[in-house]
């Protein structure tokens, strides 16, 4: 399973990229607004850091404007993926853009049927939201499993991006459920690298080394 980072914070993206684990980036209007910067400016800077799919979301909910925004965003860089919300207007836009060779990521997926429609419309990616489904008592991972099974049975090439990831356990569950990608906040990526026994082991190695060879050797 590939790892994307879910943020518009360029510093977080740069730090995660230095770990050598990133395959792409997802952003959304809320994340861009949080940074207080121009969308195109942020996206272009991200493209210079990560050589992989960069999802940039349209703002409009009207079919024609979605297409217009998508075309403009796609001109920024070859790695741009147009992120479009799951709705009737969005499906129409995905169909048009995909036929033009523009990659799309249908977001705000909360059911396997939504994922099927998005895939058949031509979406490159679908993004089911784990955390938000969990919030309403509907285990998000079950939806990911359904989508993964359905895509496999029917040989659908659309890739699954597990989104609304809040914990390392969400990442593990997504990987085991068959998600192709998990898009993860920076803090969760860092949490994934930690373990109490690792810290204890490192501390012991350092103490043993200092005992044998002296400090700062």
UniProtKB/Swiss-Prot annotation:
It is found in: Cytoplasm. Pathway: Carbohydrate degradation; pentose phosphate pathway; D-glyceraldehyde 3-phosphate and beta-D-fructose 6-phosphate from D-ribose 5-phosphate and D-xylulose 5-phosphate (non-oxidative stage): step 2/3. The keyword Iron-sulfur does not apply. It is an enzyme of class 2 (transferase). It catalyses: D-sedoheptulose 7-phosphate + D-glyceraldehyde 3-phosphate = D-erythrose 4-phosphate + beta-D-fructose 6-phosphate. Pfam families: TAL_FSA. Its EC number is 2.2.1.2. GO terms for molecular function: aldehyde-lyase activity; transaldolase activity. GO terms for cellular component: cytoplasm. Keywords: Cytoplasm, Pentose shunt, Schiff base, Transferase. The active site is at residue 83. GO terms for biological process: carbohydrate metabolic process; pentose-phosphate shunt. SUPFAM superfamilies: Aldolase. Belongs to the transaldolase family. Type 3B subfamily. Transaldolase is important for the balance of metabolites in the pentose-phosphate pathway. This is Probable transaldolase. It comes from Clostridium botulinum (strain Hall / ATCC 3502 / NCTC 13319 / Type A). The gene is tal.
